[in-house]
Amino acid sequence: MSSSNSPVKSTGSPFIQSLKPRDNLASMGSSTQLIIKDIGEIHSRLLDHRPVIQGETRYFIKEFEEKRGLREMRVLENLRNSISETNEHDLPKCTDVMQDQLASVLKKLETANHTIHRLQQRELETAKEIASRAGDQMMRAHWEPFMKEQEQRRRTVDEEHRKAVMRLKDQYVTMEKELSKQISF
């Protein structure tokens, strides 16, 4: 059995070795062929699990998708319920609280606006006062040299007037002397 030309090899039994080459089927009888075919089917059913695994995989995927769909439907239903509850109960409460708070915030805002308006008025008045003081100081700064110049001109005019008066007095005195000389003749 262990000779080199025996159908038995170290890889398996002679029956399995005879199954591997399909061209040996023609040399065997028809009953043997049917037996080998049945054994091949039994072998594929017992040892080849691919169709079973594929079927189980399809079944698992189908069940998973159904359960997932149901779970998602439950999640969506819960979400719809919570949204409708929020719309019916929480939203009106929030709206009422917001309206109440909005009124107080509006009053505070109006008060702050009025206060800021008063501060702006004060600031404007202060700026006008500062501008007025600056204008007054500038006017005084121009006024003092103007008054000094006017005083200088007045003195000059007074001096010229005094000199003119003195000339006229001298002239009248000389005229009177001449007149008195002429009258005495």
From Swiss-Prot:
Coiled coil: 98-182
Biased segments, Polar residues type: 1-16
Positions of region (Disordered): 1-24
InterPro entries: Bloc1s5
Keywords, ordered alphabetically: Coiled coil
Pfam families according to UniProt: Muted (PF14942)
Keyword Membrane among UniProt keywords: no
Transmembrane region(s): none
GO cellular component assignments: BLOC-1 complex; transport vesicle
Superkingdom classification of source: Eukaryota
Subunit structure: Component of the biogenesis of lysosome-related organelles complex 1 (BLOC-1).
Function: Component of the BLOC-1 complex, a complex that is required for normal biogenesis of lysosome-related organelles (LRO), such as platelet dense granules and melanosomes. Plays a role in intracellular vesicle trafficking.
UniProt record similarity statement: Belongs to the BLOC1S5 family.
Protein name per UniProt: Biogenesis of lysosome-related organelles complex 1 subunit 5
